[in-house]
Amino acid sequence: MRFFAVLLVPLVFAEICPMDKHAICNTGHLSCTCSVSQEDEAPVPEISCNALIARDLETGNFPVVSVEFDLNNSAEALEEFPEDAFRDKISSSLRVDEEDVIVLRTSCVGTDDTLTIQFVILKKDTNSSALPFAIEDLIDAESIATRMKAMGHLSQIANLDVDTIEYTEELVDLEFEPSNLELIFKAILLALIFGFFFVLGVWKLTKKGDEYADDLQKP
């Protein structure tokens, strides 16, 4: 019984992952949708964060810093990604202005215990209104990732445990598409849970019926 209770816990208590609402990142004219949730039936409230950057026309790639967080032991009380605290930590560590830190992705990539944040940092002389930003408008993402890896205090950012810090040109998809195998597994799991409680209910009703019949047969 305890096993099934554990399985149902993520459905009852809100946590960062999995996301049940569309995620909006940044503020002002740079506010954009950085993650689309399949659970949220509401229209996407802001433009895609893809509109902020001049991605490669053929591959859709763009150089970013990618930070992967392990949520297993550090996100129990959080219902959403603490963007302000993240931005504050990055800006103070790298000595850049907070408003120059542009978050492009906040994604659970189909997991309950991993959060991926992808971001870029504007150069000081970049006009933040001149969209989309080209690679030349940004501080080199690879050098940022290298500097962050060398900073021991960045093993935790915004009270979240950091798993990896990497330079990449592959942006995480705005909307995670689960594989057919994953969908089948979840369907089977739900069917097993439903079947267990159904059989348990029938057994209890049958047991009560037998006890009632025994009482009637008593002199």
From Swiss-Prot:
Glycosylated sites: 72, 127
The keyword Nuclease is assigned to this record: no
Its membrane topology: Single-pass type I membrane protein
Disulfide links within the chain: none
Signal peptide range in chain numbering: 1-14
Membrane-crossing residue ranges in chain numbering: 183-203
Keyword Transmembrane in annotation: yes
Cytoplasmic topology ranges: 204-219
Residue ranges, Extracellular side: 15-182
Localization: Membrane
Superkingdom classification of source: Eukaryota
Keywords of the record: Glycoprotein, Membrane, Signal, Transmembrane, Transmembrane helix
GO annotations of cellular component type: membrane
Record's protein name: Uncharacterized protein F13C5.5
Protein's organism: Caenorhabditis elegans
Source taxonomy: Eukaryota, Metazoa, Ecdysozoa, Nematoda, Chromadorea
